[in-house]
Curated annotation (Swiss-Prot):
Protein name as it appears in the record: Transcriptional repressor NrdR
Listed GO MF terms: ATP binding; DNA binding; zinc ion binding
Gene: nrdR
Cofactor comment text: Binds 1 zinc ion.
Family of the protein in this entry: Belongs to the NrdR family.
GO biological process: negative regulation of DNA-templated transcription
Extent of Basic and acidic residues compositional bias: 11-22
HAMAP family: NrdR
Mapped zinc finger ranges (unnamed): 3-34
């Protein structure tokens, strides 16, 4: 594995262990050339997935992009990184086991919305504001109002 700091191709694995949910192997690596230490993750990829954008363009599925979008929505919210990672792993497993190789971006967005809806309502609204392309304050008001009316009485 190439060192991300100096580019040396000869790095050493110092420690390997499964992640908490056993979905990946976490490896601590050391670069003898520059002395840097870094972590890599090895994950099973069941199939190559392609995301079909709303305009018809296609791009390879990027787990890190999905993770970044969820982290942005959950920024400064009381949800730990491991929980976010488990949700992303769950979404990826669902996509890979669907049998489809081309996945509409709207399907991924809906899956994220479902998970965020149960995880954190503020993050849910944040994500929805981008996913549903809110343009005015009234768009937020209408969306939040639907959350209130759809919520069970308590």
């Amino acid at each position: 594995m190439r060192c991300p700091f100096c580019g040396n191709d000869d790095t050493q694995v110092k420690d390997s262990r499964p992640t908490e949910d056993n979905s990946a192997i976490r490896r601590r690596r050391f670069c003898p050339a520059c002395g840097a230490r870094f972590t890599t993750f090895e994950r099973v990829q069941l199939r190559e997935l392609t995301v079909v954008k709303s305009g018809g363009s296609r791009e390879p599925f990027d787990r890190e992009k999905l993770l970044r979008s969820m982290r942005i929505a959950l920024r400064k919210r009381p949800v730990d990184a491991d929980r976010i990672d488990r949700v992303v792993n769950s979404i990826v497993r669902q996509l890979e086991s669907s049998g489809e190789t081309e996945i509409p971006s709207s399907q991924i967005g809906e899956m994220v919305m479902v998970h965020l809806g149960t995880l954190d309502k503020v993050a849910y609204v944040r994500y929805a504001s981008v996913y549903k392309d809110f343009r005015e304050v009234t768009d937020f008001n209408q969306f939040v109002e639907t959350l209130r009316t759809d919520a069970p009485a308590g």
